[in-house]
Amino acid sequence: MPFLWGLRQDKEACVGTNNQSYICDTGHCCGQSQCCNYYYELWWFWLVWTVVIILSCCCVCHHRRAKHRLQAQQRQHEINLIAYREAHNYSALPFYFRFLPNSLLPPYEEVVNRPPTPPPPYSAFQLQQQQQLLPPPPQGGPPGGSPPGADPPPQGSQGAQSSPLSGPSRSSTRPPSVADPQSPEVPTDREATKASGTESGSPMAGHGELDPGAFLDQDSECKEELLKDSRSERGGVSPDSEDKTPGRHRRFTGDSGIEVCVCNRGHHDDDLKEFNTLIDDALDGPLDFCDSCHVRPPVDEEEGLCLSSEGQAREHGHPHLPRPPACLLLNTINEQDSPNSQHSGSPS
């Protein structure tokens, strides 16, 4: 720098008046006997300029910050003023909103703790379906009873009515992905069996009493129907459903397992013996038998609707008449199709 450069200069010898020489320690020779220095050679000159520059930068920064702060305050003041004017001028709803509150939803705070109506029970939809499927009462008589000269309705027909009602309602509760496919011959066989059960129940009701021989006939019909159903399923369904056997009752236990029992009606004929051997060969071991097909197991998800239909039949019928055995066809579920089999590796 210039002032350091001046400090590094050697002493300069000057010639004064009368040819007298003198030496300048700093600066240069000027005049007769003086030593002078330039302004950029002075140290305080550069110090002053440095301080001036620093102060100028500080002033500029402070001015810009104050300007930005003032602009922000002005914008906030304008926003507050606009909001105050809007709230003051439009305290009521606008004209095009005054006719809408009746059609708008209520606020959330008004209905969060005060529902207007409780949810309908789960059995309401099932009862409505059953009422739609029931035949209408006769026009001449009262809706709740029968004409004075007519015979009481047979209990067998009521059982035949309750069993087809429980079938669609139970199948409606099951998801379509879990339902197993069936051959087209099965529904026709079931309809024929139901029609024969209804026809056989009407003459028994005409005599006024039910004989035990009719019960045995219906038991044999149920067994034949179950065997026919199993044969048709084995002939027309995919190989995945070949393990289905007639009379098997499956119930999900809730712990990813299925309890299986065989309908044991107390008759040991050739069909049941052959049926037992088939089950032992298919399942590699003996299988538990149910106590009775007429004793209902604990109600599960698939058979929960049967109780409501039977209760209605008891209300409309006569309790003193014995109830004929109703042939219930249970739609079993393949272990491969059930969602629990994907997580559990052990066979059911």
Swiss-Prot record:
It is found in: Membrane. GO terms for cellular component: membrane. Residues 134-155 have a biased composition (Pro residues). The gene is Wbp1l. The keyword tRNA processing does not apply. The chain crosses the membrane at residues 42-62. The modification Phosphoserine is found at S177. InterPro entries: WBP1-like, WW_domain-binding. Residues 331-348 have a biased composition (Polar residues). This is WW domain binding protein 1-like. GO terms for molecular function: ubiquitin protein ligase binding. Residues 156-177 have a biased composition (Low complexity). Residues 220-234 have a biased composition (Basic and acidic residues). Keywords: Membrane, Phosphoprotein, Transmembrane, Transmembrane helix. One of its GO terms (biological process) is hemopoiesis. Residues 111-253, 306-348 are annotated as: Disordered. It is a single-pass membrane protein.
